[in-house]
């Protein structure tokens, strides 16, 4: 067998080869300390969930470190494996048998359409893990909020999750508009209706979100 690790990223990172080398090196060191008869291979892969562009940072150690002239051939390289989740093909996604197939599909469609609302009716087997991952990788805390209020089995497909997100968004916006009107902030009502960043700022101002 081998030891596998995963590093989730939403943005490309220049020094990722150094980070992964550190993780893998620590794992090999741990095996030595446990005095394994024969240490096993360690493989850490990077799952990149960005939807604006593909991973465009170095994937080789030699591309991020300074190597004095004449020493290049003596310095060992270290290559990392990066999967651009939002650019996976249908054939590649079809190979997944776990909930990750649902997650991968979500990001592929999100890349193609930023306003994508999932209609995937595939049953999610591990709801907590999937919603926590989506929350972390999209920055949308509403996925975590669903976990806090969900009844067992209530939100076990992406289409039911999406429907609830839409309802939550409408309820929040309605509450915000009422608060703005109560404070006679007519111009801010207009901003909240069309500007996502302004709306988020107002949500925080009125304590609608943290």
Regions found by a protein language model. Name each.
Residues 1-96, 164, 196-204, 208-210:
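Accessory alpha/beta interaction modules
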Residues 1-10, 83, 107-210:
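Short, charged alpha-helical interaction segments and adjacent helix-coil junctions
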Residues 38-41, 73-76, 102-108, 122-129:
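Glycine-rich, flexible loop segments associated with nucleotide phosphate handling
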Residues 85-90, 94-115:
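Coupling/switch segment of ABC-type P-loop NTPase heads
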């Amino acid at each position: 067998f081998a030891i596998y690790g995963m590093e989730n990223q939403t943005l490309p990172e220049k020094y990722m080869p150094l980070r992964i080398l550190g993780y893998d090196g620590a794992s090999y060191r741990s095996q030595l300390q446990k005095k394994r008869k024969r240490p096993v291979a360690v493989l850490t892969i990077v799952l990149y969930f960005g939807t604006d562009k593909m991973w465009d940072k170095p994937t080789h150690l030699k591309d991020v470190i300074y190597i004095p002239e004449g020493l290049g051939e003596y310095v060992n390289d270290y290559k990392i494996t990066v999967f651009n989740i939002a650019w996976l093909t249908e054939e590649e996604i079809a190979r997944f048998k776990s909930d990750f197939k649902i997650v991968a599909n979500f990001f592929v469609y999100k890349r193609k359409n930023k306003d994508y609302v999932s209609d995937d009716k595939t049953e999610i087997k591990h709801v907590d893990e999937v919603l926590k991952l989506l929350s972390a990788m999209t920055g949308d805390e509403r996925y975590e909020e669903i976990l806090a209020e969900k009844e067992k089995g209530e939100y076990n497909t992406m289409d039911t999750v999406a429907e609830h997100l839409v309802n939550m968004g409408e309820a929040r916006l309605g509450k915000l508009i009422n608060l703005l009107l109560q404070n006679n902030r007519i111009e801010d009502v207009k901003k909240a209706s069309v500007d996502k960043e302004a709306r988020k700022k107002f949500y925080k101002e009125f304590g609608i979100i943290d």
